[in-house]
């Protein structure tokens, strides 16, 4: 999957979010990178995505004039999974939704319980 197609898939995933989710998203950017850097993936585990920021439930009254939170989606680790196009698109979707769940305040333990880990 070429980068433009990968980015388009992410745009389509974001465009398909329900209205209740879109209405609550603010000060968030989604960035596609080829690979995570060493700080993002110190163990080199093939990180697919990463949320960096202050989740919605943790934002207080002092949450003003701050840099946007970031969801990083890493293209090459997705491609290295060796999936067929349809399965790859579904994995990208799962990654985007997983990182959005962190933005909404859900932790990995809970996401594992509901099958989103």
Place the predicted regions along the sequence by residue:
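Short hydrophobic/aromatic patches at helix-to-coil boundaries
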Residues: 113-117
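Active-site rim/adjacent substrate-binding subdomains
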Residues: 1-91, 103, 107-112
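Short alpha-helical catalytic segment bearing the HExxH-like zincin motif
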Residues: 91-99
């Amino acid at each position: 999957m070429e980068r433009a197609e990968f980015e388009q898939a992410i745009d389509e995933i974001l465009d398909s979010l329900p209205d209740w989710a879109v209405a609550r998203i603010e000060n968030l950017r989604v960035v596609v990178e080829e690979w995570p850097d060493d700080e993002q993936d110190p163990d080199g585990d093939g990180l697919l995505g990463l949320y960096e920021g202050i989740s919605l439930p943790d934002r207080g009254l002092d949450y003003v004039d701050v840099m946007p939170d970031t969801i990083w989606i890493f293209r090459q680790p997705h491609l290295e999974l060796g999936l067929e196009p349809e399965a790859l698109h579904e994995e990208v979707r799962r990654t985007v939704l997983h990182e959005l769940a962190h933005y909404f305040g859900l932790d990995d333990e809970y996401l594992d319980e509901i099958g989103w880990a």
